[in-house]
């Protein structure tokens, strides 16, 4: 006597035949034994605690609206109408949409361009320092790290500059899940001391598309972030997506270093052959 209408597959045989019994069997509604994503107190809370431990964060949130929802929650947490936020020109559209929603004012930093490859690079420390000096009342600095093309900024330096100016540092880490588990890779947002980071587990962590983590540091109030998330997040959180996040987190925690060591070796081989 509850949703979803497919009744764990019995109510929609065609869907069951396409996805399989196990898949539709996991697609259930929030109920007390399964916890609730909007206010987790048991199994979802445990999954979030394990994720926070794996990513060395003060707290982690399971996100089922893609990293778009993670990025927007970061910005809405720290920005109010009229606040300035320093960010690169090559931000994801979710950043711009968040500014529309909260009324914050962007202060753009133009990234350098690699003329030979025709791609934008990371935020340069000098340019960030200029923006901070020119806009001392800005509330935060947002960094793409890495960019879509894998370019990293000097994240530790930018975090330190932001904090020295009394600003938060937010990181769109959509393409940087592997930074937390590989050896010899660029520094992760949490290791660099960032206040919040959005991590696309489905991009390089192995979870299902649309699943993501929002990570926060010790100086961000987890309860307030939960309130912001619940302003926009569905009240029918997908247990398929949440399960995939938890399983993929465990997989990386146990096997991440060896997986990404192999990936680095493959990338080095491909680079050598291409060159």
Question: Model segments located where?
Answer:
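N-terminal glycine-rich, Lys/His-bearing helix-loop that initiates the first secondary-structure elements
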Residues: 1-24
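Conserved PLP-enzyme active-site core in the AAT-like
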Residues: 15-18, 36-39, 54-57, 67-275
